[in-house]
């Protein structure tokens, strides 16, 4: 398994950026040692890019389920977008193919990121909800309708406590928090959900977590396992 140090990632990104090869960075990682260690490395990478290398390009970073809330919060003040992979459309599918993971553990950082976005937007005098494209605003009964109302207190949404939010310096907390919103991705075809289940999950994510995008990734068989669909 290949790994890069935060300094190596920063060097690559800044060199590519100077040559106009890239406009931004998508930073993701498998779990290295444990979620806390992995998230710490990702935070250090973003902190170096923004502060030492003065990188002002777009950054999308994955949040690692199980990582400390403080690390996810600090990372959110350095990233443009964050995402947490839902992995599979239903909890039953996740339990079948990845029993070491739980949907609750995946949704926890997703809710925390949503709370931080709401807190920042309300402080900045904006609507709690992310803006949608103009076409979506005029569609009746769209997938974005009947979203749960969010109060002015991000702590009311749960998962992230007001004490952890106050742990950051005032200057850092006043910065934009994940201004481009959060997204997720789920694998389609590895489990037997029907279209109604897939769209219901997407609707729930848009309405209850105010995601900017739900992405779908087609299942591609790599390993042989009786729990996985046949290659035929």
Can you describe what each PLM-predicted range is?
Residues 186, 193-196, 200:
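Ordered, small/hydrophobic-rich secondary-structure cores
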Residues 1-181, 188-191, 205-206, 220-230:
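Conserved Radical SAM active-site core
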Residues 200-219, 231-232:
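Helix-loop elements that line ligand-binding/catalytic pockets
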């Amino acid at each position: 398994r290949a790994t890069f140090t935060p300094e190596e990632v920063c060097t690559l990104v800044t060199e590519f950026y100077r040559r106009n090869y890239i406009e931004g960075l998508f930073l993701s990682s498998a779990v290295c040692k444990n979620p806390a260690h992995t998230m710490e490395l990702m935070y250090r990478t973003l902190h170096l890019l923004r502060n030492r290398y003065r990188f002002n390009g777009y950054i999308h970073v994955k949040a690692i389920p199980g990582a400390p809330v403080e690390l996810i919060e600090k990372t959110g003040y350095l990233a443009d977008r964050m995402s947490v992979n839902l992995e599979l459309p239903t909890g039953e599918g996740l339990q079948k193919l990845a029993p070491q993971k739980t949907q609750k553990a995946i949704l926890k950082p997703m809710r925390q990121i949503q709370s931080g976005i709401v807190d920042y937007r309300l402080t900045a005098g904006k609507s709690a909800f992310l803006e949608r494209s103009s076409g979506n605003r005029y569609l009746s009964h769209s997938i974005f309708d009947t979203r749960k109302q969010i109060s002015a207190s991000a702590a009311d949404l749960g998962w992230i406590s007001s004490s952890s939010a106050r742990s950051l310096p005032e200057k850092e907390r006043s910065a934009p928090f994940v201004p481009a919103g959060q997204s997720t991705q789920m694998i389609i075809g590895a489990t037997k959900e029907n279209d109604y289940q897939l769209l219901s999950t997407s609707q729930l994510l848009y309405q209850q977590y105010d995601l900017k995008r739900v992405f779908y990734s087609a299942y591609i068989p790599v390993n042989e396992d009786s729990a996985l669909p046949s290659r035929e």
